Amino acid sequence: MRHNGAEPRTMNAAKGSIVIKASVVDVYQRWLAFEDYPKFITAIKRVRKLDANHFVASLGFNGKQYDATLEMMLCVPERRLAWRTLADRHAPDHFAAGVVSFAPLSDQGTRVTLKLTSSFGGAVSSRVDKYLRNFKSLVEG
């Protein structure tokens, strides 16, 4: 598939999960705090919310800076969130999408599962694991 006359995009995908010692309500609410994304998603430098379902994220990948408009596509409270980048002037030749799921555990913990698909390059699997570890540290203190 060619996009804007560029070479075909290579898509990378990865999935990871982690158990966090906090209730699903607390974990979900913390993930919804978009302004905290740079604290655990190291590729995001800052986030600006546009409306209830859209925000612009300033990203840094492989020594390059991008701004990407993201759309929240699915929001099932305390269960699942899904988002994707929109094709726009910010990053016309790149695409990313993600789904994060929250599963309550019997010991008041929460299993967080993150799936990412990206054309921004780099090792998506190592980023997923790192983002989850960072998020766990942020939530658990």
Q: Residue spans of the language-model regions?
A:
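Hydrophobic ligand-binding cavity/cleft-lining segments
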Residues: 2-56, 134, 138-140
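Beta-strand/loop substructures that line and gate deep hydrophobic ligand-binding cavities in soluble
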Residues: 5-8, 66-74, 82-141
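Residue-level marker for the onset of beta-strands and adjacent loop->beta junctions
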Residues: 14, 43, 55, 68-69, ...
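Short beta-strand-to-loop capping motifs
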Residues: 20-22, 59, 116-118
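Short strand-connecting beta-turns/loops that link adjacent beta-strands
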Residues: 23, 52, 77, 105-108
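Alpha-helix boundary recognition
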Residues: 32, 73-76
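Short, hydrophobic/aromatic-rich segments at coil-to-beta transitions
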Residues: 49-56, 76-84
